Amino acid sequence: QKQILDYPLFVYVCDGTDSEKLDWFRIINIAGEQLTDQELRNAVYAGSWVSDAKRYFSKTGCAADTLAGDYLKGASIRQEYLETAISWAASAEGKTIEAYMGQHQNDPSAVLLWNYFRSVIDWVQAIFPRKRKEMKGLPWGLLYNTHGKRTDLDPKKLEAEIQRLMGDEDVTKKSGIYEYLLTGEERKLSIRAFDRRDALAAYEKQKHKCAICGEEFEFEQMHADHITPWSKGGKT
């Protein structure tokens, strides 16, 4: 105890704007276990709001972990759950995390953030009731902000599509299925590209000739593509 009490400390008193303080915290955050970006933000925007928000999002076994641990990546005690929730809520209002925290810094409670977060998870569980490991870490809040008011999302039809796509060997990114079903963006699935073996087999089968013009080309001059697009049932 004496060694601890007698240990000399450096004390920094920071003046300036919130952004200047945040930059200064980043400069001195170089020794020991480095703080995460959200831990630094919590220091800069310390107040009643952050204290209450941490009650929901920042403790082992916290309410957010109990409700949505299967959907979130990171660790609550390193403020990653809190960062995720704030980033989603801030995005809904077209703001940065820093701007959102600055706006609410002196609010007496973070119940609005918690209610928003619960709405996100309730929506996810309503349209995708079956939990899968591929759901962990997806940008659910951003998807909710865009698609949360849609009335055309049928959970049974979505589940049937999920099962079909999970069994499709050409879909190499299974976690992208959920975003694909909501956005229609095929790139989310990372459809399996032709490898050299597949392309060479097709090249030999076609006797080195282009299937479109009928001319003969060297293999390196040819490009392999689906006869029928993947979206219409074509296979790689």
Regions inferred by a protein language model and the residue ranges of each:
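A generic structural signal for well-ordered coil/turn residues at beta-strand boundaries
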Residues: 5-8, 206, 223
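Active-site-proximal structural scaffolding
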Residues: 17, 195, 203, 234-235
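Glycine-rich, flexible loop/turn motifs
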Residues: 31, 190, 223
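Intrinsically disordered, low-complexity boundary segments flanking structured domains
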Residues: 1-2, 210-215
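Short, charged surface segments at domain edges that flank catalytic/cofactor-binding sites
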Residues: 169-212
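Histidine-centered nuclease catalytic patch
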Residues: 202, 214-236
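Solvent-exposed functional surfaces
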Residues: 2-185
